[in-house]
Amino acid sequence: MSVLYGIAAATVTATASFLLTAVLAALLRAPALRLAVVDRRRRRPVPLLGGVAVVLVTAVVAWAGDRAGVVPLGPAAGRLLAAATVVGALGLAADVWRLRRRWLLAGTAVAAACVVPYGETGPVAGALAVGWVALVTGAFRGLDHADGVVGTVGVVTAFGVGACAAVELMDGPAVLLLVLAAALAGFLLHNWHPARIALGACGSLFTGFLLTGAAVLARTGYGPVGGAGVLCALTAVPVADAVLVLLSRRLAGRPLSRGGPDHLAHRLRRLGLTAQGVVVVLGGAALCAVVVGVLAHTGRVGGQAALWVAGGAAAGVLGLLRVRVYGPARLRRGAGVRAPVRRAGRGARAWAVVRRPRTAMRRARAGVSQAPRGATGAAGGASFRAAIFPVRQATSTENVQVGAPLRVRNG
């Protein structure tokens, strides 16, 4: 009877979480638009308060179940839920006031330090766990760049980590992750393409922190090498997305904190996949990796199975790095800005380099020497000056075309 009672209680709790999140997310869309809490990086502004619905419903349903004695959480899951709620509040502040990433990372690390069980992991492994939780939580936030991606990956990962917790007889974290999975499923009703509302930093950080923190709790007591392999398998998709973004920006010479269309979903869309197809591919990849992680955690497969997941993720990252997402390559430092000018007496255009005066002088002399016979010295001098200072005032029928992103006006 106790088993049947537990199944019935979990089913009722998950159903309530699903329905409440679906209703609350729909209600929060209008206030988000009215307060201009929207994501403007997409083709159309998308409200960002969907994460508030996920955080509130998950916390309230789990707390109510614990208070009623239906699904007791226990002290470890209670601390995890409280810390995740604080991280979600920090993410909400980032959605409203655009906090810097360093503050989000620092706040997430402080919250993770309050959750990791140092008595069982030790100080060194505990510090590594804190760093891993903070970084992978930020990686989950990076998944919130396309419709349905972070919700789908979050649901799959929640079931996987919940299964690992259930194997360890950790009923509190298992029930908490079931409630989270149901809340994300209810949210996906509004986040499927075309999305009517998005998680934002609030929901994505809350989801990532809850999943990574529960995974650390479930793997406590195991060896560090095997534990790291299982943790990476459970979170393979967000980790691969973060590695892909960091590598591509580093190789392109872009600042790491500068956003761009360089995530997994963006590159898959450039390969021809639809928005729904991208969600299916990433969800399937997350499912395969999570299944391997759960089997490795239970001992059904050896620890080397995680290496296959890492190898597949590395191959995918290297393959997607070849997809161009930044457009034409930037001009190298010192190469100068080229601008087209007309030679005196001719219709052809000559290119002069603004930032390299010697090159401009040589090309200007060549242009003067090729001028037609009979041209006056004033015309030759005008061509010479125009090549050195190529930007000029456009007439009513001409437009100055500058071959660089920067436009310069004559003072």
From Swiss-Prot:
<dbReference type="GO" id="GO:0009103">
    <property type="term" value="P:lipopolysaccharide biosynthetic process"/>
</dbReference>
<feature type="transmembrane region" description="Helical">
    <location>
        <begin position="169"/>
        <end position="189"/>
    </location>
</feature>
<dbReference type="Pfam" id="PF00953">
    <property type="entry name" value="Glycos_transf_4"/>
</dbReference>
<feature type="transmembrane region" description="Helical">
    <location>
        <begin position="45"/>
        <end position="65"/>
    </location>
</feature>
<keyword id="KW-0472">Membrane</keyword>
<comment type="similarity">
    <text>Belongs to the glycosyltransferase 4 family.</text>
</comment>
<keyword id="KW-1003">Cell membrane</keyword>
<feature type="transmembrane region" description="Helical">
    <location>
        <begin position="197"/>
        <end position="217"/>
    </location>
</feature>
<feature type="transmembrane region" description="Helical">
    <location>
        <begin position="70"/>
        <end position="90"/>
    </location>
</feature>
<keyword id="KW-1133">Transmembrane helix</keyword>
<dbReference type="GO" id="GO:0016780">
    <property type="term" value="F:phosphotransferase activity, for other substituted phosphate groups"/>
</dbReference>
<dbReference type="InterPro" id="IPR000715">
    <property type="entry name" value="Glycosyl_transferase_4"/>
</dbReference>
<dbReference type="GO" id="GO:0005886">
    <property type="term" value="C:plasma membrane"/>
</dbReference>
<feature type="transmembrane region" description="Helical">
    <location>
        <begin position="7"/>
        <end position="27"/>
    </location>
</feature>
<feature type="transmembrane region" description="Helical">
    <location>
        <begin position="148"/>
        <end position="168"/>
    </location>
</feature>
<dbReference type="GO" id="GO:0044038">
    <property type="term" value="P:cell wall macromolecule biosynthetic process"/>
</dbReference>
<feature type="transmembrane region" description="Helical">
    <location>
        <begin position="301"/>
        <end position="321"/>
    </location>
</feature>
<feature type="transmembrane region" description="Helical">
    <location>
        <begin position="120"/>
        <end position="140"/>
    </location>
</feature>
<dbReference type="GO" id="GO:0071555">
    <property type="term" value="P:cell wall organization"/>
</dbReference>
<feature type="transmembrane region" description="Helical">
    <location>
        <begin position="277"/>
        <end position="297"/>
    </location>
</feature>
<protein>
    <recommendedName>
        <fullName>Putative glycosyltransferase SCO3672</fullName>
        <ecNumber>2.-.-.-</ecNumber>
    </recommendedName>
</protein>
<feature type="transmembrane region" description="Helical">
    <location>
        <begin position="227"/>
        <end position="247"/>
    </location>
</feature>
<keyword id="KW-0808">Transferase</keyword>
<keyword id="KW-0812">Transmembrane</keyword>
